[in-house]
Amino acid sequence: CDLATSDVFTVNVVADPVIDTQAIASQEVCRNTTVAQLEITVSGDNNTGAFNYQWFVNTTNTNSGGTLVGTNTNTYTPDNSVVGTFFYYVVINQTASGCEVTSEVSTIIINEVPTITTQPIGSDICLDGAANTLEVVTENGVGTPTYQWYASTTNTYDLTNPIAGETNSTYTPPTNTVGEVFYFVVISFDGGCSDIQSTIALVNTVAEPIAT
């Protein structure tokens, strides 16, 4: 029998897509504050179709499995409403070739918003007496808290009169002048949480009684 010869078949081997820029590795924010968008850049053979994206979130630090949370774009903005630690990654494929690549994990930590657990307490003090120290204690938040104490002659949050140099969690008011002064502190966090204010504490300095 004569030999039979098949038609020629061309097999085109192409490389998987390449992630040129990974998404931000980690970020830590307060609940309901801005989370930086996750973004990757990808390159590959343009003849094997458009890039398809599938973003996943995990509760463990792995780039497999998890819950599908976003598709069709190289960017994704993580949810900021639930406290916890979440791990995001994206799978990129080209449907014409079946080639795909998986990103590294981006860790997103959502912390509870800061609160003040100990508020400053006002008092009545005799002129030139030893004043009670005003103090605040906070919990939660992101980063190191910074403090600024304010004084006002009215029972309002007047931000026009910061007390110079008083940037700690405690403040001892002066008692060398008779009268009412209202104090409060504004606490800021370098991790992006919103500022919080203490309650207002009234320090009433009164004159010593005069014996007659």
Give the ranges of each region predicted by the language model:
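Hydrophobic beta-strand segments within extracellular beta-sandwich modules
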Residues: 88-89, 183-184
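Short beta-strand segments of immunoglobulin-like
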Residues: 24-30, 121-126
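Short, solvent-exposed loop/turn segments at the edges of extracellular beta-sandwich modules
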Residues: 1-2, 93-99, 188-194
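Solvent-exposed loop segments of extracellular immunoglobulin-like
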Residues: 44-57, 139-151
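Surface-exposed, flexible coil segments in extracellular/virion-facing regions
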Residues: 56-81, 151-175
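Interdomain boundary/hinge segments at the C-termini of tandem beta-sandwich modules
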Residues: 9-15, 107-112, 201-207
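A short beta-strand segment in extracellular, disulfide-stabilized domains
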Residues: 33-44, 129-139
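Proline-enriched interdomain boundary motifs that mark the N-terminal boundary
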Residues: 15-25, 112-119, 207-212
